[in-house]
Amino acid sequence: MGNFRGHALPGTFFFIIGLWWCTKSILKYICKKQKRTCYLGSKTLFYRLEILEGITIVGMALTGMAGEQFIPGGPHLMLYDYKQGHWNQLLGWHHFTMYFFFGLLGVADILCFTISSLPVSLTKLMLSNALFVEAFIFYNHTHGREMLDIFVHQLLVLVVFLTGLVAFLEFLVRNNVLLELLRSSLILLQGSWFFQIGFVLYPPSGGPAWDLMDHENILFLTICFCWHYAVTIVIVGMNYAFITWLVKSRLKRLCSSEVGLLKNAEREQESEEEM
């Protein structure tokens, strides 16, 4: 992650998966309330989506792991350089380990929805584990760095740790849509904050560099972090409104088609009686 693209990659991953989790939670909730939405509310569809989600998470994790190891100048799976007598790019191994635990989450997703004997709640436990590992890694990621660098990573640790707590609560309290949406909003915040860290530490396109020892920059980024979270709340709200409208409009079309079929059946019955 020693450049802007290295922060944009996990930022994109987390933002996409956060938006998907938000959409899935809202869709499940609306479909339970509107039971006539037919196939949209079927367990078979959601099980297939969970398996597809697991495959996607595994693919994202493998992409991140390969990127950390095999980029030019990367560690190339060598943890210790015996010739030089020191550890080899441990920060890259930090990121590799983070991706690895999210890969385990994807594997758990696939197994829990293909093997009926496994508890579905295992996925929430694996998500909580992955997030706690990520928080632990980034907490110990910035020793000896500049003040602003440490601060933006501390904010990242805060949101990751809170997301892990929410995921663990979901493990204990199942099918709570508010907890699911809170977790989704925090994952979205994590994704957008990765981008913000990239802009601060590695300004793209030759932009002006941030003074990493300026206290006013810390004051601004404190406000900026709150703005990021406000945007994620707006995204969740807009997503909820859109999915509600989409499901209800589909329900209206189904109802109108059912009414039309009933009218046609009545007309056919009346014509048969007349004959």
From Swiss-Prot:
Entry superkingdom: Eukaryota
Membrane topology qualifier: Multi-pass membrane protein
Main location, first listed in the record: membrane
Keyword Membrane recorded: yes
Membrane-spanning intervals of the chain: 7-27, 51-71, 100-120, 150-170, 218-238
Subcellular location, record wording: Membrane
Keyword terms, alphabetized: Membrane, Transmembrane, Transmembrane helix
GO cellular component: membrane
Protein family membership: Belongs to the TMEM45 family.
Protein name as annotated: Transmembrane protein 45A
Biological source species: Homo sapiens
